[in-house]
Amino acid sequence: MSSSAPSSASPKTFRVKSFGCQMNVYDGERMAELLAAQGMSAAGDGDDADLVVLNTCHIREKATEKVYSDIGRLRRADGSAPLIAVAGCVAQAEGEEIMARAPSVKVVVGPQSYHRLPEMVADAAAGKRSTETDMPAEAKFAALPKRRKSAPTAFLTVQEGCDKFCTYCVVPYTRGAEISRPFSDLVEEAKLLVAGGAREITLLGQNVNAWAGEDDKGRPIGLDGLARALAAEPDLKRIRYTTSHPNDMTDGLIAAHGELEKLMPFLHLPVQAGNDRVLKAMNRSHTADSYMALLERIRAARPDIALSGDFIVGFPGETDAEFEDTLRLVDAVGYAQAFSFKYSARPGTPAATMENHVPVAVMDERLQRLQAALNRDQLAFNKASVGKTCEVLVERRGKHPGQWLGKSPWLQSVHFSGEAEIGDMVTVELIEAGPNSISGRLA
């Protein structure tokens, strides 16, 4: 859809602001590459940009209102504003409303259509407002430019969309059905990332372990086969993946954790709740016991694996006793890190129309208790790492002279001082643990 408005000069500088998940970070990087390929330059820190792309997230409540707040803050002191594009999942879900409520927005583009961003920006500069929220994911990836320079850690989207339809979640409606990118495309993009400087690649998907394809010999493979193929790249030192669903943890993927040295001992495997009635109401298609049994198999394959999870407190109808089941599950697992949220009703999802919504004050109290338990376990995991010697991938400089920051194999933030360069793999002895990071020294 398009409409006419007064024309403005073609933008020469841009800024992409991404919110939310790691896939949004990946999408934001690809949008920046698209714009740079058209001859535009990224605006420096503190500089005004001719074009601002708000790459939005729709998972949490009030996401749409946050977009309008961000749009308002883009108006400059002299009353002018940059050309504004709204991208991402809020654009997908609320695109027409954004165009109606925010005349300063010239472009609305969904997460499966952002390959069209350059031509939509050109139309906007010529006075045409436009909205594009189709879902041609395959066409999107085919149209994106080749990867060039990369940081030491890089994201690679291998799968998009979700077919699980958890009752609280908007992803199937904003990202669409599950699609897997072709094996050959992923191997090519990974090689380009490594050639550009990446030493660690995180494979991304809304349901990443549902990825399926055929290898270069036409044989059907899953995510474990893709990881094995990427591990053959000599200069790629580490492989991670996120986010996974328990029902798609195959025997092959579990085995890969015990067999592939480059597949890091870290797994983000959300459970969301520890009570079976709540899990059924969420349409999670697993029980607390089946989740725990799965973790036993994973730990048997890789005993030192660090586990991460997601939790929702206050799902409609959740009782005090049912919440206590979640706390018991947390105690039994001992997560290395995890993320917890209050239930947030999303328009259009089945859970939004369920009865017996939990009062906010009750959700607040449950979240506080759950987060305290998760923080306790994260600190305990970090303290148990003290005395270990491990490889750390150096990602950036620290706040202090001579200090470096990087990640351990277990995704812990590690800071140390000494001779190093960004992108180096260095051996570090872990000497002191805090709740969110570990200090070390070069071994």
UniProtKB/Swiss-Prot annotation:
Belongs to the methylthiotransferase family. MiaB subfamily. It holds the Pfam family UPF0004. It catalyses: N(6)-dimethylallyladenosine(37) in tRNA + (sulfur carrier)-SH + AH2 + 2 S-adenosyl-L-methionine = 2-methylsulfanyl-N(6)-dimethylallyladenosine(37) in tRNA + (sulfur carrier)-H + 5'-deoxyadenosine + L-methionine + A + S-adenosyl-L-homocysteine + 2 H(+). This is tRNA-2-methylthio-N(6)-dimethylallyladenosine synthase. GO terms for molecular function: 4 iron, 4 sulfur cluster binding; metal ion binding; N6-isopentenyladenosine methylthiotransferase activity. Its EC number is 2.8.4.3. [4Fe-4S] cluster 2 binds at residues 162, 166, 169. Residues 148-380 form the Radical SAM core domain. Residues 383-443 form the TRAM domain.
